[in-house]
Each structure stands twice: as C-alpha cells, then as structure tokens.
C-alpha cells in the first residue's frame, strides 16, 4: 500500500532533505514527502499520493523508512532560523505542509515533532480542512 511513496522517494528524498536544510524548496516532491489526507488535492498526482485515512497515516508513520524520513525532514524544518513557511515552500506548498503536519500530529499524538512544526510555522494552528475531512 505504501510502495507508491517508497518508489517516489527513492530518487528524490535526498534532494528534498537538502533543499529543506538550505531553507528553500526548488523541485517538485511535496506530494510524497509531506502527504496529505485524501480530499484536499485535486490533481491526479495529489490524489495518487494522498493518505486515505488516519489508519494509513499511522501506517506511514510506523513504516521504518517513511516514518523515519518524515521525522528527519520535519526536524530539518525545525532547525531553520526563520518561521515563514512561504519563504521555504512557496504559497501553495506551505498550505500542503500545514495539512500534512496536521494529519501526522493526529496520527502520532505521542510524537511532538509535527505539532512543533505547526507551532513554529503556523502559530500552533492545525489545518481546518484536514480536521473537517477527518471529522475532528
């Protein structure tokens, strides 16, 4: 089920991590590095890489490769000096980050890193559309 993420990240994860560490996303990988709940993105790519529900988000988080990478790249975001997600990701992808961090904050409530990203970049606010889709 999660193979689509592993396949996509195989070629792009190192570049994505390097871009985040530099503080500026310059290539196209947001969908499969910071996935969102199904129902937000309308493109075929967004739909393909969407997470269907909280259970799949928990599986992603618990996966030995995907979960570790998500925590690592989220930690890289926390180590940046600034707190403007638009400066790092641009307008649209900064919204995708907020929804992804909201999803994983709910899927892994015992791991503070996702809420810490929300605290730093979004004043602690979670994404309202993600919450609505999840019925929270």
Positions of PLM-derived features:
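Charged phosphate-binding loop/patch that engages nucleotide di/tri-phosphates or the phosphate backbone
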Residues: 109-136
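Amphipathic alpha-helical segments within well-ordered protein domains
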Residues: 17, 58, 101-102, 119
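C-terminal end-helix/capping segment
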Residues: 50-69, 128, 136
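Hydrophobic/aromatic-rich, well-ordered segments within soluble, folded domains that form packed cores
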Residues: 19-54
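Mid-chain, well-packed structural core segment of small domains
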Residues: 59-108
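Extreme N-terminal tail/first-helix region
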Residues: 1-14, 129-131
